Amino acid sequence: PVNIYVIMADQGPAHLPVSLAVHTDMLEYVPVSKDEYFQKLKKA
């Protein structure tokens, strides 16, 4: 599946809103912190 990384707000629930928690055969929303997001960008 293709991972779509969603940057979570600094404060708030650690889970994605229901409207964004869409799982299909090709898409998977992965909530990450901003630091984790930039680390993944560096590895890519």
Swiss-Prot record:
Record's subcellular location: Nucleus, Nuclear pore complex; Cytoplasm
GO BP terms in the entry: mRNA transport; protein transport
One of the record's GO cellular component terms: nuclear pore outer ring
Keyword list, A-Z: Cytoplasm, mRNA transport, Nuclear pore complex, Nucleus, Protein transport, Translocation, Transport
Oligomer and partners: Part of the nuclear pore complex (NPC). Forms part of the NUP160 subcomplex in the nuclear pore which is composed of nup160, nup133, nup107, Nup96 and sec13p. Nup85 may also be present. This complex plays a role in RNA export and in tethering Nup98 and nup153 to the nucleus.
Function of the molecule: Functions as a component of the nuclear pore complex (NPC). Involved in poly(A)+ RNA transport.
Protein name, UniProt field: Nuclear pore complex protein Nup160
